[in-house]
């Protein structure tokens, strides 16, 4: 797909325009097709660009794009937030919610606001409640409580099937293109679950807990305080999962909407935290599947 053509760009804009017009006319089933096509085009182009670029200075790219947004007069506030995010990353820390507030975009005209929308759209007059909130990722609202519990129960079964029959050597072998081994992925799942376990305890014992940011992905290759084998890491993960499921199933449904203050993401509910971790795990299953295929081919 050649995205460097006027036709590609014009088609993308036309799809968004068509979707907006169809929504105004109440033809939502057709509008969803136009929006899906636009999203597919954008994601496909980004997927190709990431692979073509290879190693890239992410901090510098953020700064470059912030400058481009200023030139296009998109949003000075957003450009400034991107610069603050780049500065935090350059210092080796996670940007806070104060530095990178949640963005809201008017669904009618595209006007962008950082932080809660308290007034009508400055461009088209749309009501505050009609703005689209851009969450840090889709995991927050992916699963409602019963679906999240079902997924938390299912994922260890899928992981067990993926690692079945593999030796410790195979599970400790790095990916051919570099990156994590199966051992690292399972360690990451175990570590992330540990964060969920701890935060669930905070929600159970405190009215409005403060949730510290955790760079969990940086722990996956550390070997200190790890069980000696990948299978033992998995068994530890599976045992803790059973305990978490028991506690979640005992919670009154209303308690899922209790909120805490996350240092990175701001106000979050227990429902969003459980959805986050349950959906996050799914993104690693294809990674384990690919590593399994690599191990089987190497036999």
Task: Show where each model-derived region lies.
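General detector of N-terminal leader/presequence modules that precede the first folded domain
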Residues: 1-45, 160
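Short, contiguous alpha-helical
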Residues: 2, 6, 31, 60-103, ...
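Secondary-structure edge/capping motif, primarily at the C-terminal ends of alpha-helices
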Residues: 19-26, 163-166, 170, 295
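Structural signal for well-ordered, non-membrane alpha-helices
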Residues: 20, 156, 160-167, 194-197, ...
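Acidic/histidine-rich alpha-helical segments that form the ligand environment
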Residues: 47-88, 105-108, 155-156, 160-162, ...
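Short, cysteine/histidine-rich loop/knuckle motifs that typically chelate Zn2+
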Residues: 107-110, 119-126
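Short microdomains enriched in Cys/His and/or Lys/Arg
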Residues: 125-161
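A short, mixed-charge helix-start or loop-turn motif at secondary-structure junctions
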Residues: 141-145, 223-230, 266-270
């Amino acid at each position: 797909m050649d995205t460097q053509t006027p036709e590609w760009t014009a088609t993308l804009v036309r799809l968004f325009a068509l979707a907006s017009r169809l929504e105004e006319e109440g033809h939502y089933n057709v509008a969803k097709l136009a929006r899906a096509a636009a999203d597919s085009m954008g994601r496909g182009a980004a997927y190709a660009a990431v692979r073509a670029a290879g190693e890239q200075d992410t901090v510098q790219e953020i700064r470059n794009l912030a400058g481009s947004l200023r030139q296009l007069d998109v949003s000075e506030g957003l450009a400034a937030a991107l610069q603050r995010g780049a500065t935090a990353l350059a210092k080796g820390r996670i940007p806070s919610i104060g530095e990178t507030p949640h963005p809201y975009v008017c669904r009618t005209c595209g006007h962008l606001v950082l932080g809660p929308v308290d007034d009508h759209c400055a461009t088209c007059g749309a009501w505050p409640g009609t703005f689209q909130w851009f969450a840090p990722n889709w995991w927050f609202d992916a699963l409602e409580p019963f679906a999240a519990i079902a997924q938390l129960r299912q994922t260890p079964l899928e992981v067990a099937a993926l690692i079945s029959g593999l030796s410790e050597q195979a599970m400790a072998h790095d990916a051919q293109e570099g990156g994590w081994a199966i051992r690292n992925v399972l360690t990451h799942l175990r570590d992330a679950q540990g964060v969920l376990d701890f935060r669930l305890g905070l929600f159970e014992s405190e009215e409005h807990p403060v949730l510290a940011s955790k760079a969990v992905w940086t722990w996956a290759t550390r070997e200190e305080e790890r069980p000696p084998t990948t299978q033992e890491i998995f068994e530890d993960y599976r045992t803790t999962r059973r305990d978490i499921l028991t506690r979640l199933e005992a919670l009154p449904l209303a308690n899922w909407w209790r909120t805490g203050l996350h240092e990175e993401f701001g106000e979050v509910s227990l429902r969003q935290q459980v959805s986050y971790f349950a959906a996050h795990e799914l993104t690693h299953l294809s990674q384990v599947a690919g590593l399994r295929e690599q191990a089987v081919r190497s036999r």
